[in-house]
Design a protein with these regions (language model features):
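Extracellular Ig-like/FN3 beta-sandwich strand-entry sites
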Residues: 540, 569-573
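Beta-propeller blade termini and top-face loops
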Residues: 1-474, 481-484, 514, 518, ...
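Beta-strand-rich binding/interaction modules
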Residues: 168-170, 486-487, 494-513, 573-577
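Mature extracytoplasmic or organellar-lumen-exposed domains after removal of signal/transit peptides
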Residues: 580, 587-589, 622-748
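Contiguous beta-strand segments within globular domains
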Residues: 460-499, 503, 542-544, 615
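Glycine-centered tight-turn motifs at strand-turn-strand junctions
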Residues: 509-565
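Short acidic/polar inter-strand loop motif in beta-rich domains
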Residues: 551-555, 580-587
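Low-complexity, Pro/Ser/Thr- and charge-rich linker/hinge segments at domain boundaries
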Residues: 434-460, 588-622
Length: 748
């Protein structure tokens, strides 16, 4: 014997690994719950610290033993100083999530147990922020292997599990919990056959959609509580194969392994029918499927005929048909990596294998049906994601930018597909509307109806249309795009310009876009941004309308401290028109109100009317300023050709009048950022400031804005009158005199 240190072999079944330093035969590493090192050939051992725990692999640089990479349940870490310190794992998206649940709040939250950590609750969107950060997630009920259950409309109380039947009920308001075990028995170290309740590592817990306040929890049988865990009752017999020869001590012949992960003969999944009260299905880790249609009073074995012993990892009741049910099974524990999805259309009486198209090796863990489009299925496998458009007759990969990693669970929720991975955290596919509308590629152009958008404020790297962004960013999660995400297909590329218009319910144009972008746009400091350009590529195109009204014009080469973007369109239904050549396609786009915004009836409409009129006024002002400034410059050139002194003097007087008006409207000395501190704002800058000061996340027109606009509108009335007179009377009259003198006129 080299060492009697129990730490070396305490959980040999799970993770004990031995590594020798390639540069020193007396340096040995043993990975277990701790990472241990001996520098004297195993006589004494020291513990490496600085990373997570539960160690599985180690790489030692053969040219430099100080450089190591270690892997554990928290990710990977790098050391360059012989393990004295390690790189942080907190910035690495390496979480392993088992089972997904989500609430119905906005933004909705995702819940799951995270391997060797707490359970997690994380927002799907960070309102008012640019990305999903640490402030958007917290712990939830249960532990690392938790199923989490709650009323999705009121998720104050969350019931979460952990291994060996540990359950607690978390009050998210008080941030306190109570333990609600079905039987508070210490099972650690016991043989499975000696356990009253034999729990799966991921023992199912579900909240009943049809019985308020009722939760179900599964061991080898089903238990129910109707009083938040105060009492539990058995509502099924043993629904497993109950094989005694597989219920001994785990990990033998080396060490006993009895922490729950190795339990066998347990219920691995339970689901309630969304259509019918009292209808539940269970699936066991040894290959049995059962159904009850009377709330557990009686159960029927509906296991597919000929199904071998396997893990029934997920069950899905079709959201479109009460009699249709899907199961995802796997036999990887038998070294069989064959995908095996099954479908029944008669409550499990008969089954068909629907795995065609999923390659060998991609064994199946979960299948879900889309909530809007019947027969649109999503499957998560050991090697990635698959989709079927025809109820499982044929599958194809939809890996896209998703890391190639095991998919442990899927959930279709609020128009999104939420993905739980083994080692690459949560991912969300936001654009299920496109999947729901998809048909085989056509030769003609096609415009798809976008998913509804919320009129909320947040930033997202998904707002742009650049193909270079791959859907992830360092350190933080990615917010979904803020706006209507519009997809369209183009059959071929040519010189034809494509254009898009957005109209409100009254038919008024809110904004418009073109594949040629802003013709004649000029960029300068303190000026407006360009109007986004419509992408134009053969095949599928993606364009995000940020819900904004048209960008207001600026005044060339004048710096105004302001935002020129139009205010955001208010909740309602809008018409989207796409013109490709002579063909015009239309669809609708829906904007929803953010539920958490405190608004009153008519508030959005009042805000929209105020902002629309104010922005229209500013647009008119700047158009007039630009037009008269252009006319003044033309007049200056024309006067250089005039010999008649009287006519020249009259022209100079007209120029001075235009210039005086212009100086009241804009500050032409302001050319750069800090110039606004040196030169006072003029009229349009004040007006634009009012627009920006009134625009806000929660639409509200304060009395101060109303009063300020009255003041400015009174000033504008006089300025506009003078400008119109210059444009329609004085310049045209002088033009007549120029024509009479045989000199070209000023163009307006």
């Amino acid at each position: 014997m080299v060492s009697a240190d129990n730490r070396l072999t305490q959980r040999a079944w799970y993770y004990t690994e031995v590594f020798t330093d390639p540069n020193n035969e007396n340096v040995v590493y043993v990975l277990s719950a701790p990472a241990l090192r001996s520098i004297d050939g195993g006589k004494t051992w020291e513990r490496l610290s600085g990373t997570h725990g539960d160690y599985h692999d180690l790489w030692i640089n053969p040219d430099n033993s100080k450089n190591m990479v270690i892997a554990n349940d928290g990710g990977a870490a790098v050391s360059f100083n012989y393990g004295k310190s390690w790189s942080t794992q907190s910035i690495m998206p390496t979480a392993q999530f088992y089972r997904i649940n989500a609430d119905n709040l906005f933004p909705y939250n995702i819940y799951a147990g995270q391997q060797d950590n707490t359970s997690v609750k994380i927002a799907s969107l960070s309102l008012g922020r640019g990305s999903i950060g640490r402030e958007d997630w917290t712990y939830s009920a249960g532990g690392e292997s938790a199923f989490l259950a709650f009323d999705p409309d009121n998720p104050r109380y969350v019931m979460g599990g952990s291994y060996l039947g540990n359950i607690n009920l978390l009050d998210t308001h008080s941030k306190a919990s109570t333990k609600v075990l079905t039987a508070p028995i210490q099972y650690l170290g016991r043989a499975a056959r000696d356990m009253k309740y034999l729990y799966n590592w991921n023992a199912p817990i579900i909240w009943s959609k049809h019985e308020p306040g009722t939760f179900y929890h599964c061991a080898q049988l089903v238990l129910r509580t109707r009083d938040m865990g105060m009492t539990w009752e058995e509502v099924s017999p043993d629904l497993t194969r109950n094989q005694d020869d597989k219920q001994g001590n785990g990990g033998r012949p080396y060490t006993n392994e009895a922490v729950g992960a190795e339990n066998y003969g347990t219920i691995a999944y339970m689901i309630e029918s969304p259509h019918e009260k009292g209808v539940f299905y269970t699936g066991s880790d040894d290959g049995l499927v059962h159904i009850t249609n009377n709330g557990g009073e009686s159960w029927q074995n509906v296991t597919p005929k000929g199904l071998q012993e396997c893990l029934v990892n997920a069950i899905e009741v079709s959201p479109h048909d009460p009699a249709t049910v899907y199961i995802a099974t796997t036999r990887y524990k038998f070294n069989d990596y064959t995908p095996a999805l099954y479908k029944s259309t008669d409550y499990g009486k008969t089954w068909s294998n629907i795995s065609s198209g999923i390659p060998q090796g991609s064994f199946t863990r979960v299948v879900r049906e889309d909530k809007d489009r019947k027969n649109l299925l999503y499957a998560g496998t050991e090697k990635g994601m698959y989709v079927s458009w025809n109820g499982g007759q044929k599958w194809e990969s939809i890996q896209l930018n998703l890391p190639k990693t095991p998919i442990l669970d899927l959930m279709v929720h609020q128009g999104d597909l939420i993905v739980a991975t083994s080692g690459r955290s949560f991912w969300i596919l936001d654009d299920l509307g496109l999947f729901r509308a998809y048909e085989k590629p056509q030769m003609a152009a096609k415009l798809y109806e976008p998913e509804a958008a919320y009129n909320g404020f947040w930033y997202s790297a998904m707002n742009g249309n650049s193909p270079s962004f791959k859907g992830s960013q360092p350190f933080t999660g990615v917010n979904p795009a803020n706006g209507l995400v519009i997809y369209y297909e183009l059959p071929k590329l040519d010189s034809t310009e494509i254009s898009m218009e957005i109209r409100d319910a009254k038919g008024k144009v809110i904004n418009s876009f073109s594949s040629k972008g802003d013709k004649g746009y000029k960029r300068y400091d303190g000026g407006p941004p360009p109007t986004p350009k419509l992408p134009k590529s053969q095949g599928l195109n993606r364009f995000v309308w940020n819900l904004g009204h048209a960008i207001m014009p600026g005044v060339d080469d004048i710096y105004i401290e302001a935002n020129y973007r139009g205010h955001r369109a208010i909740p309602g239904t809008y018409t989207i028109s796409l013109k490709v050549g002579d063909k015009i396609m239309q669809t609708k786009g829906v904007i929803k109100e953010v539920p958490s915004y405190d608004t009153t009836p008519g508030q959005y409409e009042t805000f929209d009317a105020f902002m629309t009129e104010t922005e229209a006024n500013l647009t008119e002002m700047h158009q007039m300023v630009n037009g008269l400034f252009k006319a003044k410059n033309q007049l200056k050139k024309v006067l250089e050709k005039v010999d008649d002194e009287g006519l020249k003097k009259e022209g100079k007087t007209l120029m001075d009048e235009i210039d005086a008006w212009d100086k009241e409207m804009v500050q032409r000395k302001s050319k750069a950022y800090d110039d606004v501190e040196n030169f006072p704002n003029k009229f349009t800058a004040e007006y634009l400031y009012l627009i920006n000061a009134t625009d806000s996340s929660i639409p509200r027109v304060n009395q101060s804005s109303v009063e300020r606009r009255k003041e400015l509108d009174a000033q504008w009335s006089g300025l506009k009158q003078r400008g119109v007179a210059l444009k329609t009377i004085k310049i045209p009259e002088f033009n007549k005199k120029l024509w009479a003198a045989g000199i070209g006129a000023v163009q307006l």
